[in-house]
Amino acid sequence: MSQKTLFTKSALAVAVAIISTQAWSAGFQLNEFSSSGLGRAYSGEGAIADDAGNVSRNPALITMFDRPTFSAGAVYIDPDVNISGTSPSRRTLDADNIAPTAWVPNVHFVAPINDQFGWGASITSNYGLATEFNDTYAGGSVGGTTDLETMNLNLSGAYRLNEAWSFGLGFDAVYARAKIERFAGDLGQLVAAQNPALAPVAGQIPSDTKIAHLNGNQWGFGWNAGILYELDKNNRYALTYRSEVKIDFKGNYSSDLPIAINRFNLPIPTATGGATQSGYLTLNLPEMWEVSGYNRVAPQWAIHYSLAYTSWSQFQELKAKSTAGDTLFEKHEGFKDAYRIALGTTYYYDDNWTFRTGIAFDDSPVPAQNRSISIPDQDRFWLSAGTTYAFNKDASVDVGVSYMHGQSVKINEGPYQFESEGKAWLFGTNFNYAF
């Protein structure tokens, strides 16, 4: 595998792996910004204002709060993603639990200024992915370790025009940190089998040889906006937008292969003998539109729904360059725009207890021909339930749980053919307090 190809796949895994855990929405997007939302499959988030977390989705909801309100919690993600297959070398490609468990924390604060103005702030994560394979995995040249975390800092404000219309605007600062490692696996054996003249060199590369290590971190900036229309106190609708965020990763590349191996022109990344090279990669995180609604159809019952549209077609290629300006790779990705649809219901049992449930469908933006075991993306179906217990008018606790089921997919990557299947359980809790 050439350095150009290796960097293409490594950078893809790094750039789209923006998460503190495995991504559990389509593509590499995260929804886990609140536990109440988790319990309703994040349906109606732009129009519901039951806790401060909703403001991170729609800043116009700030006008629905009459007291400073705080919410903090986390969602625990327990994925079960398995890969199967057989390499041309006859070595197994089976790997279980390639996505690690992790916590996705969230913190939110909302404060009214007067009857017309208010502000809010939040700390969340909106994109990401993480996968881990054994160092001696046969498909190590496309597997290995992929881990990238993001933190989204949002500051927003809102203005109420009248009893019906409210508008909000926010600023996003996104910090991303990435790490990718790739190993030789059986790539040396495959090269030796195809070209016996190279067998003395390629055939001697141990499976756990680190053929690529890439890490980097950077800030990116964007904005979000929202409109809230209140037909009356029981019916409201929202339109929200979150902009594209450009991340210019700056980092290091190295390979443990001895430099002398470069003269054989093997299909593996250029060896550095453990030395480090500097490089950079630009990734455009896609923009998202969402339409939401909330209807209190009875004194104790409400329904809520959302349709989100993410412009994944903005993610068409990946290009990595050295600091000298040389193109290390250029690869067409061809993602397609995708949607997410969610529907839920809430039951207001009494002043203390609230129960909710929801279902959702995540459309995968990754075309079948572009799937990777570092991004084993697939269409996903959500089933969710949750509850809120209010201790009094000031303090409450949210609990939510979701089960996510992904369809089985086939992946063709390099000389390998895989099958992937995945599911996940998500558990969340938040504490809310109004001052």
UniProtKB/Swiss-Prot annotation:
- Single Gene Ontology MF annotation: long-chain fatty acid transporting porin activity
Q: Name one GO cellular component term.
A: cell outer membrane
Location in the cell reads: Cell outer membrane
What kind of membrane protein is this, topologically? Multi-pass membrane protein
Cleaved signal peptide residues: 1-25
Q: Which UniProt keywords apply?
A: Cell outer membrane, Lipid transport, Membrane, Signal, Transmembrane, Transmembrane beta strand, Transport
Annotated Gene3D superfamilies:
Outer membrane protein transport protein (OMPP1/FadL/TodX)
Q: Give one Pfam family.
A: Toluene_X
The record, for InterPro entries, names: OMPP1/FadL/TodX
Domain of life of the source: Bacteria
Function description = Involved in translocation of long-chain fatty acids across the outer membrane. FadL may form a specific channel.
Q: Give the family from UniProt.
A: Belongs to the OmpP1/FadL family.
Which named protein is this? Long-chain fatty acid transport protein
Protein's organism: Salmonella typhimurium (strain LT2 / SGSC1412 / ATCC 700720)
Query: Corresponding gene?
Result: fadL
